[in-house]
């Protein structure tokens, strides 16, 4: 049996895939930069070796799975080619693995990680299920029939997948370094729809998804009456969301989720529709929905003194709006403070005005310097361009995080897809050392 070596094992998808293969009985190791990432914990708990990059890591008999951020000129990929060791990109390998199961791909511009996690959690209550979530969490369940996995549209990587089912949460313009406009994004999703084998579950309230065409049935979900699966009688509380589901205008069941914001009702509705199609009973779905603990870096909360600190991956204006809405629902009457680190110069430039508008929904805004991706390290834009759009916003650096102490009893919402966590960690240290 081959051993798998992951080039860039700390990436969220790569880490999750390594966990899946390890659980299924394969020998797995990987390499990456030495900087600590939150994805390491699950690897370390399984005893999966994480090595510094070196061409000496590659040996005959291995199969190399390469992260998409690493070029063919990377020393380990070059070493593999010289040794005749097979090299396969992450998304291509994932496509091959998914083909061995009844596969359910979860995709969409927003909400796919939470929806993948929620679907995996609910399906496990009915059948043995393997899963790969984009928060760095993966599980390979020996003997499982189903494989639930997150499918990213970036660079059309999800076109490597030919799933039995696909959930499509929404279509929005994002990744402006790759997609030209929202029509370009739509065309990618249309291509994906053509590759689905059994059925598609799509949000009918989305402006674009109702225009998707496919050779398989499309089940629409949402709040509108024209949807196959409709949520009605929505109740928001400080404990979460409750709602009734009607299937083609006939009452199906009542559900509750310990998550916040109307976007999470839609995420749950997608899961309910897919499970209904696969014959999972309403009682099992309801029970599992109520025990969902969330996914990493999606509204992850902790209390420090009299403040609540929330860590969230939100890095698009629509996601910021949803996260701040959720914070206000759970903590009504408390000051909501946004601490935001923009992710990539191209995205910040493209959505500068929209970022400002979404952040203005907080009571106070702090901005961290722009985080450039692995593909871009600097741009003409600076964080001050965004600051100029947000009255009374302040710049935040790691060494001056103590300024956040003035917001007593507040909800501090740290948002971003880069290394925003280091600001939260620095603040927690500042509070503890006071």
Curated annotation (Swiss-Prot):
EC number: 6.3.2.8
Alphabetical UniProt keywords: ATP-binding, Cell cycle, Cell division, Cell shape, Cell wall biogenesis/degradation, Cytoplasm, Ligase, Nucleotide-binding, Peptidoglycan synthesis
GO BP: any one term: regulation of cell shape
Binding site residues for ATP: 108-114
Region forming the signal peptide: none
Top-level division of the source organism's lineage: Bacteria
Function: Cell wall formation.
Family assignment from sequence similarity: Belongs to the MurCDEF family.
Name this polypeptide is given: UDP-N-acetylmuramate--L-alanine ligase
Name of encoding gene: murC
């Amino acid at each position: 049996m081959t051993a798998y070596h992951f080039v860039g094992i700390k990436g969220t998808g790569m880490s999750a895939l390594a966990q899946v293969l390890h659980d299924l009985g394969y020998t797995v190791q990987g390499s990456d930069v030495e900087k600590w990432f939150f994805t390491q914990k699950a690897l370390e708990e399984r005893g999966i070796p994480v090595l510094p990059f070196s061409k000496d890591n590659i040996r005959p008999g291995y199969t190399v799975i390469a992260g998409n951020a690493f070029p063919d000129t990377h020393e380990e990929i070059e070493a593999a080619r010289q040794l005749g060791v097979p090299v396969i990109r992450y998304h291509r390998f994932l496509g091959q693995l998914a083909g061995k199961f009844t596969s359910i791909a979860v995709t969409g511009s927003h909400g796919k990680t939470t929806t993948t996690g929620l679907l995996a959690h609910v399906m496990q209550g009915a059948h043995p299920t393997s899963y790969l979530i984009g928060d760095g969490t993966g599980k390979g369940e020996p003997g499982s029939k189903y494989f639930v996995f997150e499918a990213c549209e970036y660079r059309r990587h999800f076109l490597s997948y030919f799933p039995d089912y696909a959930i499509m949460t929404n279509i929005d313009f994002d990744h402006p370094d790759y997609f030209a406009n929202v029509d370009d994004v739509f065309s990618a999703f249309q291509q994906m729809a053509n590759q689905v084998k059994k059925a598609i579950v799509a949000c009918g309230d989305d402006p674009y998804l109702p225009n998707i065409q496919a050779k398989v049935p499309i089940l629409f979900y949402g709040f509108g009456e024209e949807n196959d699966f409709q949520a009605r009688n929505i109740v928001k509380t400080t404990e979460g969301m409750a709602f009734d589901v009607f299937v083609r205008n006939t009452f199906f069941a009542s559900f509750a989720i310990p998550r916040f914001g109307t976007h999470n009702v839609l995420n749950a509705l997608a899961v309910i529709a897919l499970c209904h199609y696969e014959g999972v009973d309403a009682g099992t779905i309801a029970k599992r929905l109520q025990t969902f603990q969330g996914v990493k870096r999606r509204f992850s909360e902790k209390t420090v003194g009299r403040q609540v600190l929330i860590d969230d991956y939100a890095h698009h204006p629509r996601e910021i709006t949803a996260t701040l809405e959720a914070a206000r629902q759970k903590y009504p009457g408390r000051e909501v403070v946004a601490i935001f680190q923009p992710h990539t110069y191209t995205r910040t430039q493209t959505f500068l005005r929209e970022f400002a508008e979404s952040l203005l929904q907080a009571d106070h805004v702090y901005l961290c310097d722009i985080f450039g991706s692995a593909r871009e390290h600097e741009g003409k834009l600076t964080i001050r361009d965004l600051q100029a759009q947000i009255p009374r916003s302040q710049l935040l650096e790691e060494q001056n995080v103590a300024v956040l102490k003035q917001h007593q009893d507040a909800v501090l919402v740290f948002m971003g897809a880069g290394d925003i966590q280091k600001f939260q960690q620095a603040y927690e240290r500042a509070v503890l050392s006071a």
